[in-house]
């Protein structure tokens, strides 16, 4: 195995160890792929230690925490990215090329769907640890489907078309009884060129 891998018992231990090393010998990036409510603390500690961060979306579960991270990144000038992984897929890049080349004409309407079957049942009661935190407002934030899945569609819309969203109306609803967060999310967007999505 040619790769030197160092294990740690906690991110605090990792950050303390990495912060002692010269820049060229540190880890390249800290990847934060924890449940949503556990993004802020390790991200902030990495930024403060000068360690670049690539964080799963959503950035945090509160606007205040997100604002704090943005301020820290700007102050410390540490590279920071938020994962919108579908943008790197070849189909996204091909779609972007086709749409932006003008081959299809002006963008007037964009339709996007992202269907996940696990939200149709109470997967959180069936032993799915991932489902448990994704539908818990304390751990997931203010939205399940919209915040977790809708963000992919909106980011893809901007990436492929090159257009910005001028106005957005969102409708979140919960079909599964007893669930605290949305399991259905619909948006209507007005785009910067007058098109709709």
Which sequence ranges carry the predicted segments?
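Predominantly a Rossmann-like dinucleotide-binding segment in NAD(P)-dependent oxidoreductases
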Residues: 79, 86-178
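Hydrophobic residues in well-ordered beta-strands that form the structural core
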Residues: 55, 61, 80-82, 111
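A short, glycine/Asx- and small/polar-enriched loop/turn
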Residues: 180-184
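A short helix-to-beta-strand connector/capping loop
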Residues: 1-6, 75-79
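Beta-loop-alpha module in the N-terminal Rossmann-like domain of NAD(P)-dependent dehydrogenases
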Residues: 5-72
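Rossmann-like NAD(P)(H) cofactor-binding subdomain of soluble oxidoreductases
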Residues: 38, 58, 81-87
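Active-site beta-strand termini and strand-to-loop segments that position acidic
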Residues: 187-194
